Amino acid sequence: MKLPKPSEGGAMESAPAGTHIGVCYRFIDMGTQKTEFKGEIKHKRMITISWLLPDELMSDGRPFSVHKRYSWSMHEKSTLRKDLQDWRGKAFSMEDFEGPNAFNTKKLIGQPCMLSVTQDVRDGNTYSNVSSVGKLMKGVKPGALTEPTIYISLEKGEFDKDAFDMLR
């Protein structure tokens, strides 16, 4: 397959800035990725969480989606831990990390939340960024998921090839 010409790639619509209802529809374990921070190169396990914005539609009628990459770390200062605690509305305890009632990230799929979306313009392109994740307010009903849900874990015994094949 030939690569498209740069003018044929099409511009992506950016999700509008503001506070939105989001529904998690993808959790992707990306494995170990090469990252650079302050000039230092490291290899870190990364994940991506994706949300649909059911009340915000693109020009083709489909809902916008937004994504956030995280280091796979639950250290007290990690962004993943902060966002998950804000999303669920309570801090993690040791029981959430071990034992039969340990928190399973698969529970995130289909879960609604409040998202703060900001926009960043770089090189003439506008990018939408998830700046914060919060618990859905009482009484607020999220829209229905209109895209297939995908959960991919690279943990031993959890990889789902069919889910992987659904990525586009």
Regions found by a protein language model. Name each.
Residues 1-168:
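Short beta-rich binding modules
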